[in-house]
Amino acid sequence: MSPEEIKSRVGSGLLSFPVTHFTSDYKLNLESYRRHVEWLSGFEAAALFAAGGTGEFFSLSPNEVGQVTRAAKDVSGEVPIIAGCGYGTSLAVETAKIVEEAGADGILLLPHYLTEAPQEGIYAHVKAVCDSTGLGVILYNRANSVANADTVARLAEACPNLIGFKDGTGKVDLVRHVTAKLGDRLCYIGGMPTHELFAEGFNGVGVTTYSSAVFNFVPELAQRFYRAMRAGDRAVMEGILHTFFFPFAALRDRKAGYPVSIIKAGVELAGFAPGPVRPPLVDLTGEEREILQGLIEASRR
């Protein structure tokens, strides 16, 4: 899939990022992962992110990222697979090459590891990854890697295969500056944790799609909310926010790392076997799983 084709697909609807499935001893469980991705592919996702943040990219080796990407491609059918990529420049370039060989349709470039960096450093890092691959690349602005609008514009001019900008900062002024400066040169994706809580505001500044974590286990609900957002149906949105997303977010916020752990718990409650999260994350308690089960059941009424 060409960079322009993946750009068009990404901007056409709701996105999600399957959790990575592990065995009880933390090894990849690709058979279980394939079953889950195949199921998700039947719910009209515009694209799926393999080994993204919720897919525990930070705990995977480059070779494991390649294995996960290939497994997703095996079963996703017409749904494009965008692979996670990140860490320092040399590791990011290595991972980009691995996932391209594994059949990825695009790359989500997650933040570089740990250290802060000036704009010139972020520019050099992103450009090196873009130059290393023929795949379309989406820049994920969050945490310690936040490119300003001028840097994004320079990258868009220098890198024809930079096709998207995903925001995880929640800084609407920065996002608006980027969208005003770049226009339709890029596609724009909302990437806040439980982005449904931010979707209406981001939609107002031209970010019309986002990646939904809960799509992992309640895809019909995620699509219903997304369609209501696009249609401007605030009554439907408000209802879903109050019955599901607000209490879900309260449960998610109980511990650091739970934005990933709670999704894995939801996937298990949906009938799959995603296994535990890898350390240093921890799984939900039994009581918390019961609360989540209640929210899922209430969302279906």
Swiss-Prot record:
Pathways involved: Carbohydrate acid metabolism; D-glucarate degradation; 2,5-dioxopentanoate from D-glucarate: step 2/2
Group of enzyme by EC: lyase
InterPro entries in alphabetical order: Aldolase_TIM (IPR013785), DapA-like (IPR002220), Dehydro-deoxyglucarate_dehyd (IPR017655)
GO biological process: D-glucarate catabolic process
SMART domains xrefs: DHDPS
Keywords: Lyase, Plasmid
Highest taxon listed in the record's lineage: Bacteria
EC code(s) of this entry: 4.2.1.41
Catalysed transformations (reactions): 5-dehydro-4-deoxy-D-glucarate + H(+) = 2,5-dioxopentanoate + CO2 + H2O
GO MF annotations in UniProt: 4-hydroxy-tetrahydrodipicolinate synthase activity; 5-dehydro-4-deoxyglucarate dehydratase activity
Protein family membership: Belongs to the DapA family.
PANTHER family: 5-DEHYDRO-4-DEOXYGLUCARATE DEHYDRATASE 2-RELATED, DIHYDRODIPICOLINATE SYNTHASE
Protein name (database record): Probable 5-dehydro-4-deoxyglucarate dehydratase
Species of origin: Rhizobium meliloti (strain 1021) (Ensifer meliloti)
Lineage of producing organism: Bacteria, Pseudomonadati, Pseudomonadota, Alphaproteobacteria, Hyphomicrobiales
